[in-house]
A protein has these predicted regions:
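Short, Lys/Arg-rich flexible segments
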Residues: 1-194
């Protein structure tokens, strides 16, 4: 009596494929998760921690930390072997201070820049034919911006400006739970019929 040979599934091959797919999924899903924090306007760990509102509320139709989108678009994943992924941003000067919060020391260059912004905003105010300023919303907005720029320009060199923590990247229990759920479903899918 001769027995039939049955092909045994290659568990190790299937497992290594799963590890590679999980690594790829974690890189993409992590970057997307951290970019979602810009839409959420806060950091999602176990619950959402909303970001502090900006002090100058002009232009509030756009979200906090969103001006050009460079910070959000600079988030990417770097592989450190098959068992480690690091999420980071491109080397933007303001990325770390926004994520962690802290203080900025006022420099002479900053003061000159704020004087420039002040002059630019007051110069673009609309005037009547007799030279008086018009009483309209555009001028009101420019006036508010101009007073903010002037107050920043008048700060003493060496004084400190507090930048609130607006975390957009870091350890997140919600993301880890999503990743665990995905891996568990993939294990069920791949190994249930073997």
């Amino acid at each position: 009596m001769q027995m039939e040979r049955t092909e045994l599934p290659d568990f190790f091959k299937e497992l290594s494929t799963l590890v590679e797919d999980a690594h790829r999924y974690a890189k993409v899903a992590g970057v997307n998760f951290f970019k979602q924090n810009f839409r959420r306007q806060g950091f999602l760990d176990t619950s959402l921690t909303p970001w502090a509102k900006r002090s100058l509320t002009i232009g509030s139709d756009r979200g906090v930390l969103i001006q050009s989108g460079k910070l959000r678009d600079s988030i990417h994943a770097v592989s450190r072997g098959i068992d480690r992924i690091i999420y980071q941003t491109d080397p933007l000067a303001y990325a770390k201070i926004h994520n962690e919060g802290g203080y900025i020391v006022v420099t002479e260059r900053m003061k000159r820049y704020f004087w420039y912004l002040y002059m630019k905003s007051t110069g673009s105010m609309q005037k009547r034919k007799n030279g008086e300023l018009r009483q309209n919303k555009a001028n009101e907005r420019l006036s508010t911006m101009a007073s903010f720029y002037k107050s920043m320009a008048l700060k003493k060199v060496g004084s400190r400006i507090r930048i609130p923590k607006r975390q957009y990247m870091g350890e997140s229990a919600t993301f880890m739970k999503q990743l665990d759920t995905w891996i568990a479903s993939e294990i069920d899918k791949r190994f249930s019929n073997i």
